[in-house]
A protein has these predicted regions:
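Membrane-integral, polyisoprenol-dependent glycosyltransferases
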Residues: 1-33, 43, 49-56, 63-65, ...
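Solvent-exposed serine/threonine-rich low-complexity stretches and specific carbohydrate-binding patches
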Residues: 79-91
Length: 185
């Protein structure tokens, strides 16, 4: 009986934990900081005009960050706002920000005092990744492009109360103040 019970437990364990989730997520991040010179915005330039369909933003530990998007104006002497402030809501997962605009440059401006973005992936009208020609200016925001999944599934995000466990563990590990005190890491 013991052998049968152990065998079934092992079999169930292997089935239950197989493909539970991804073991890789963006590790480095760019910090937008209001009041810091050049840190409130990211200004991206492309080799040529490109239709930006979406920005895929992987947020750090703080949720509900707000960003406004700008493109160069027709005269080339300023910037035009192309969106109302966009709320990027979820931590530790990819958030889609619709853009649908053809441009050679794009400015992303944070509306918050601090916003940590672990990675930004820019997708064109065909869903292909577009790396800005000045990505090296913001290396923490563009250094882990390969982690963006070709197909979105549950494996690439935290769900239900996993959000609290993962977030609390991250905060403890990095010496940050803890957001949720009722869930252990």
């Amino acid at each position: 009986d013991w052998c049968m019970m152990l065998g079934l437990t092992l079999l169930f364990g292997m089935l239950a934990f197989a493909r539970l989730g991804s073991t890789r997520a963006p590790q480095s991040g760019y910090r937008f900081e209001k009041g810091e010179s050049g840190k409130q915005e990211v200004i991206l330039y492309f080799d040529q005009s490109v239709t930006v369909r979406t920005l895929e933003v992987y947020l750090g530990v703080k949720e509900k960050r707000s960003f406004t998007l700008f493109v160069p104006n027709a005269a080339g002497d300023g910037w035009d706002q192309i969106s109302e402030p966009v709320n990027v809501k979820s931590v530790f997962c990819w958030n889609s920000v619709p853009v649908n605009y053809r441009t050679y440059a794009l400015a992303i401006i944070s509306q918050d005092d601090i916003a940590d973005v672990m990675e930004i992936v820019i997708l064109d009208q065909d869903g292909k990744k577009v790396l800005p020609k000045n990505a090296e200016r913001y290396p923490e925001a563009f250094d882990e492009q390969e982690l963006f999944p070709e197909y979105r599934t549950y494996e690439y995000e935290t769900m239900f109360d996993e959000v609290y466990h993962a977030r609390t563990a991250y905060e403890i590990t990095h010496g940050l103040s803890i957001y949720e005190i009722t869930h252990p890491p």
